[in-house]
UniProtKB/Swiss-Prot annotation:
A motif ('KMSKS' region) lies at residues 348-352. It comes from the Bacteria. The gene is metG. Monomer. Zn(2+) binds at C144, C147, C157, C160. It is found in: Cytoplasm. GO terms for biological process: methionyl-tRNA aminoacylation. It comes from Corynebacterium glutamicum (strain R). One of its GO terms (molecular function) is metal ion binding. This is Methionine--tRNA ligase. Binds 1 zinc ion per subunit. It holds the Pfam family Anticodon_3. One of its GO terms (cellular component) is cytosol.
Length: 610
């Protein structure tokens, strides 16, 4: 039965081009999942966009001497190009500085406000003494007052997991310039999380199939639940849609309140741009729809607590009750799929310190599937993992080139040389049946892993089949069979069997290696688009909804989005029979081996740090 599946991918902050650490956590895993779900016949909507509000972008715009909108435009385009080059198959990748996003965020806020879950309080706000500008929570560090760990942020301590306010920190300092912030009284709207705690707890305790680290962390957050400020003293952001506030350009909604609403606003924009303005409701109002949220572990709080609380409050499901908003009852996450961190040679990625590998540089030299493969087999799925050039070279050469590439090239080359086409097999022997049965069984077991976001387990099983197929060819020695005319039928059977296993493995590798899969599809003599690629489309800031207040987006503004026609691709999660008589051409090498020296030195643009 066809399922509706929403794939919500963390919104990258628009402060620079993407490095491989960014895409290891949210990018490649979410795309593998979405591509698999499409191949399984499900109705998939994959959305994301660039997150463009908040103080960090203002600070950077000042440094670069440009307007904040110009800076957002610059990095939005760079990120769109990076993610498209990597083959991330978004149905819509948009941005937060759109009229549609502003309007949808304001609708969520109004619903929460009308239901009594947005409360107004006087709080202490952090101000930079030298600039007078508000310091965001995450730009303040100090000692955690609960566990005593240094380096706790103004919103949360990563060591103990507790939520914090900047004023709680011991010896707080600004991460921007090291000065001690001033704390002044200011009026803000807070999301009344305690009034939603019972509903949150009930929902979370039903999430038994989540990754253990995510569920444990999320439940621990409930031990110290408190109201969280959802507005800021800042002039860059979404106006607060309340009388007396909406025209105050010095107060805007908190960037994290608006960013998580992006999954919903992007879905609404996708429906509008697709010509069916109500199509988004299939993914948000139908309780049978499954919704999966992909992110790094540092964003769990906002997706397992803040966003669900917003959805519950909007539907009037907290202790204060309330009315269901105009958008209807919106689905809570089915699963929050959080990855750990990818480091580089033992160090955290840092552009300023030169510890960085940019996606665009990587793609230019190695192409997308080498990176996609490394992230799949060695990425930070359940633990922090380290990228080294030595391991990258070893995996590309030993596994991709010598394993998968070798299987494809020698199988098709021998079939082409001896028959010029897919040969007609004779009677199958036990060895033939054994390798075919192994590939057949893998479809079901790999699917079970991918359906549970166990991407490493999935690709490990596929590569096991690849290894067994290479062993089968070595055992059958078709190059010897080719020298004996009396063994021609056996040669045909062995090569037909190997071609079928190549086809099967290619199908199962398609979510991981879509670009390579398209090449193999063509190498097997097949036509058409096997694995569709995303496209960059230039659009205008049109919106089915209109926001209110000051500082709104320009309705004539143009920007790039990522979209794609994935429904017409041929790839299905099932065996595609290789048809005898199909013409085969001599294949070009599928995967180039890398110079082993690269593992010791790294490329010029990202050398190994000694």
């Amino acid at each position: 039965m066809t399922k509706n599946v929403l794939v919500s991918v963390a919104w990258p902050y628009a402060n620079g081009p993407r490095h491989i650490g960014h895409v290891a956590g949210f990018g490649v895993p979410s795309d593998v999942f979405a591509r698999f779900q499409r191949m399984s016949g499900n109705n998939v909507l994959m959305v994301s966009g660039t997150d463009e509000h908040g103080t960090p972008l203002l600070v950077q715009a000042d440094k670069e001497g440009v307007t904040v909108q110009d800076l957002a435009d610059k990095y939005n385009r760079q990120i769109v190009e990076d993610l498209t080059g990597l083959g991330l198959s978004y149905d819509l990748f948009t941005r937060t500085t759109t009229s549609n996003h502003y309007a949808v965020v304001q609708e969520l806020f109004r619903g929460l406000y009308d239901n009594g879950y947005m409360i107004k309080e006087t709080t202490l706000g952090a101000i930079s003494p030298s600039t007078g500008r508000t310091l965001p929570d995450r730009y303040i560090e100090g000692t955690c007052p609960i566990c005593g760990t240094d380096g706790a942020r103004g919103d949360q301590c990563d060591n103990c997991g507790n939520q914090l306010d900047p004023a709680d920190l011991i010896n707080p300092v600004s991460k921007i310039n090291g000065e001690t912030p001033e704390f002044v009284e200011t009026e803000h709207f807070l999301l009344d999380l305690p009034a939603l705690a019972e509903a949150l707890t009930e929902w979370l305790k039903g999430r038994e199939d989540w990754r253990p680290n995510v569920l444990k962390f999320s439940l621990n957050l409930l031990d110290d639940i408190r109201p969280r400020a959802m507005s800021r003293d800042i002039d860059w952001g979404i106006p607060i849609p309340v009388e007396g506030w909406q025209d105050n350009n010095a107060k805007k909604l908190y960037v994290w309140f608006d960013a998580v609403v992006g999954y919903l606003s992007a879905s609404i924009e996708w429906a509008y741009r697709s010509g069916d303005p109500e199509a988004w409701r299939t993914f948000w109002n139908d309780p049978e729809t499954k919704s999966y949220y992909f992110m790094g572990k540092d964003n769990i709080t906002f997706h397992s607590q803040i966003w669900p609380a917003e959805l519950l409050g909007y539907a009037g499901k907290g202790s204060r009750g309330g009315e269901i908003g105009d958008l209807g009852v919106l689905n809570l996450p089915t699963e929050v799929v959080s990855s750990e961190f990818l480091t580089m040679s033992g160090s955290k990625f840092s552009s300023s310190k030169g510890v960085v590998i940019y996606v665009k540089d990587f793609l230019k030299e190695f192409g997308p599937d080498a990176l996609r493969y490394f992230i799949a087999v060695a990425g930070p799925e359940n633990n922090d993992t380290d990228f080294t050039w030595d391991e990258f070279v070893r995996r590309v050469n030993n596994e991709l080139a010598n394993g998968w590439g070798n299987l494809v090239n020698r199988t098709v080359s021998m079939a082409h040389k001896n028959f010029g086409e897919v040969p007609v097999p004779g009677a199958l022997e036990e060895s033939d049946k054994k390798i075919l049965d192994l590939a057949t069984a893998a479809f079901e077991s790999v699917a079970a892993n991918l359906d549970q976001s166990k991407f490493k387990a999935g690709i490990s099983e596929i590569m096991h089949v690849v290894g067994e197929a290479n062993a089968y060819i070595a055992e059958q020695e078709p190059w010897k069979l080719a020298k004996d005319d009396t063994k021609r039928e056996r040669l045909a059977t062995v090569l037909w069997t190997a071609l079928q296993v190549v086809s099967d493995c290619n199908t199962m590798l398609t979510p991981y290696l879509p670009h390579t899969a398209q090449k193999v599809h063509e190498t097997l003599g097949r036509d058409g688009i096997w694995a569709a690629s995303p496209q960059i489309v230039e659009v205008t800031n049109e919106s089915p909804r209109q926001p209110i207040g000051v500082g709104l987006p320009d309705p004539e503004h143009t920007y790039p989005v990522i979209m794609g026609d994935y429904k017409t691709q041929l790839a299905k999660w099932q065996r595609i029979d290789v048809v005898p008589g199909t013409t085969l051409e001599k294949p070009a090498p599928l995967i180039a081996k890398l110079d082993p020296e690269l593992g010791e030195t790294g490329p010029e643009w990202a050398p190994v740090q000694n």
